[in-house]
């Protein structure tokens, strides 16, 4: 009797795990189909590039630009 009960609970646990493990979130359809995701991705407008020219500058040039911006300010402070 104890073995049948333990086997029964094991089968119930396996079934519960299998049923609860299959979930469909974020609009995914059963079977891993992503039709909804593709439609929403097509609705998003694509950007052609950077919105700001300063962002497109390579990281090596940024300190020089900062120095060029601060030089006139430092010169004005010395003159005053």
From Swiss-Prot:
The protein's name is: Progonadoliberin-1
The entry's function note states: Stimulates the secretion of gonadotropins.
**Where, per the database record, does this protein carry Pyrrolidone carboxylic acid?**
22
Name of a matching Pfam family = GnRH
Protein family (similarity comment): Belongs to the GnRH family.
| Signal peptide positions on this chain | 1-21
| GO annotation, cellular component aspect | extracellular space
Q: Report whether Endoplasmic reticulum shows up as a keyword of the record.
A: no
Q: Where in the cell is it found?
A: Secreted
Q: What are the alphabetically sorted keywords of the record?
A: Amidation, Cleavage on pair of basic residues, Hormone, Pyrrolidone carboxylic acid, Secreted, Signal
Glycine amide modifications at = 31
User: Which InterPro entries does the annotation name?
Assistant: GnRH
GO molecular-function terms, A-Z: hormone activity
Superkingdom, taxonomy of origin: Eukaryota
């Amino acid at each position: 009797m104890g073995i049948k009960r333990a086997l029964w609970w094991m089968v119930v646990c396996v079934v519960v795990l299998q049923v609860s493990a299959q979930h469909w979130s974020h609009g995914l359809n059963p079977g891993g189909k992503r039709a909804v995701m593709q439609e929403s991705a097509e609705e998003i407008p694509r950007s052609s590039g950077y919105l700001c020219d300063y962002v497109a500058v390579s990281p090596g040039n940024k300190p020089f630009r900062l120095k060029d911006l601060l030089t006139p300010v430092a010169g004005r402070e010395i003159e005053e």
